Amino acid sequence: MGIHAKLETVQLPLLVSCLFPPLTMPAKDVQICPIAVDTTVFRSRTWDRLKFEIEYGLQRGTTANSYLISADKIALFDPPGESFTDNFVGTLIQRLDLNSLDYVILGHVNANRAHTLKLLLSLAPQATIICSNPAAQNLEKLLADAEVNNPIQVMKGNDHLDLGRGHELTFIPTPSPRYPGQLCTYDPRTEILFTDKLFGAHVCGDQVFDEGWTIYQEDRRYYFDCLLAPAAAQVSAALNKLEAYPAQTYAPSHGPLVRYGLRELTRNYQQWLSEQQAQALNVALIYASAYGNTSTLAQAIARGITKAGVAVTAINAETSNAEEIKEAIGKSAGFIFGSPTLGGHAPTPIQTALGITLANASKTQLCGVFGSFGWSGEAIDMLENKFRDAGFSFGFDTIRVKFKPTDQTLKMCEEAGTDFAQALKKAEKRRQPKSALPESESARTEQALGRLVGSLCVVTAQQGELSSAMLASWVSQATFSPPGLTVAVAKERAIESLLHKNSCFVLNILQEGNHLGLMKHFLKPFAPGGDRFADVATETAENGAPILTESLAYLECRVQQRLECGDHWVLYAVTDRGALLKDGVTAVHHRKSGDHY
């Protein structure tokens, strides 16, 4: 019998074969599948968005992958977070006598995972915890109030653990600012590399492995851009370490296991990392986080910066030394500080980083401040006042978030990051000397390119509480059957994050002679998170996006493909329905140069 014939889905208390899923998918379950000799994956699944974090923004669900090696010794990798605790532990008990569990191996440690660990370790008091030294220090704090006394064994680079039957595990520390205790593990018996946060994707489905791996390209790129791009230097160092291990399968914490597209995904990571490290401008993003909220904000701001073509050097002040902070400030065109407020103050590592920055930063560097708080937020005010008194200019209004961030908060942070990056790029352009050379071939080409004309349109989108819009003229019909069109969207546009595959939008076509008001409205700058539709007459389309009632016509569209083209995404969308609202002709945008809109 083949591996896939043994695939199971467990939703307590019933066992259901995932080969024949129910018509209505359960909100959460645990899928079990043997993946190699002595090795099984437990995929805790949800089809809903798990958290309000930018990395879950595609809203395609996720899996929290745990792995069990049952050799002479038994080891469990990466129990899931609090959202899956009951389902996972209940399912594990059905498959394993927890008194026989020898090791719990942790790729990383955070407060979310600690909830599951407390229950699991109370049921398996004999199990030894395997983790890195930073993870062990964090774990001792997180488990301080729990009645568990499991031994902790710290693993360093190239340390080994023999489970028997050829499963002699090797451990590879791969720290990053957000996950300073990250630990990858290689099993030579199965040639599986357990990669924790590397090579994952937030997507939920029945497929355990990545057959037809190209369908996951967008999910994996988005995951990389949100989670790993701000730590490009550390991720690049991690990949260099992992090259020494001849893996045939990547076993990540989230999404399908990587087997069929392993080489291509590895090459993609190397390319994406090279692109980040080659950016001309860099922002130092320095933060500390007490409960994870400030780091969530930092991740959203970083996403906004990197999508605008500026690199980010993320610095976790709690785990970085003075030289690292000084070097990051020295290489950056701007810096952003994020802090929680603890007892009315900023954490000591943030105060230390502040002193280093004030002593070494140039007043030409742009700055920004953000943070989360429970009651008063004094740390955020302190940082803002210190930088303002020192004469620094701010790239966005200070962001203050009470308790946990929401979808709207994260969108505001992303847009603030984009504004920050755009301000840096404009300043850099002003500093560049103007050429005194005669008209170049490229200038003549730009003039010719500018003679291409396009219909003036407004693209509008709505997802839950989030909405956005942009003026567009790079629009063209692409197909007759099905009726389809293409629209080019700059990577740094705020609406870009709402226009991924299967997303819906409305293309509002403007009318000649009645377009200037809408054109001026959507050309004006909006504050991060600002309402694009204030004082604009709209109706709601069947796909949920706004229709501008003053437009000539509209088309309800659904994104089918995204093609990365330089500094733009070219979207191919099918039109589900549309209507002519007025008699008239389409407004057309005429340009003189192809180097701007």
Swiss-Prot record:
Q: How is the cofactor bound?
A: Binds 2 iron ions per subunit.
According to its UniProt record, the EC number is 1.-.-.-
In residue numbers, the region (Flavodoxin-reductase-like) covers 449-597
Query: Where is the segment annotated Zinc metallo-hydrolase?
Result: 59-254
Give the Flavodoxin-like domain ranges.
283-421
As cofactor, the record names:
Fe cation
Tell me yes or no: is tRNA-binding among this UniProt entry's keywords. no
Q: Which GO terms describe its molecular function?
A: electron transfer activity; FMN binding; oxidoreductase activity, acting on the CH-NH group of donors, NAD or NADP as acceptor
Sorted UniProt keywords: Electron transport, Oxidoreductase, Transport
Q: Which domain of life is it from?
A: Bacteria
| Entry-linked SUPFAM superfamilies | Flavoproteins, FMN-binding split barrel, Metallo-hydrolase/oxidoreductase
Carries keyword Transit peptide? Answer: no
Entry's SMART domains? Flavin_Reduct, Lactamase_B
Q: Which family does it belong to?
A: In the N-terminal section; belongs to the zinc metallo-hydrolase group 3 family.
Q: What else is known?
A: By homology with NorV in E.coli, may be involved in nitric oxide detoxification.
Name the job this protein performs. Mediates electron transfer from NADH to oxygen, reducing it to water. This modular protein has 3 redox cofactors, in other organisms the same activity requires 2 or 3 proteins.
Protein name stated in the entry: Putative diflavin flavoprotein A 3
User: Which species does the entry assign this protein to?
Assistant: Synechocystis sp. (strain ATCC 27184 / PCC 6803 / Kazusa)
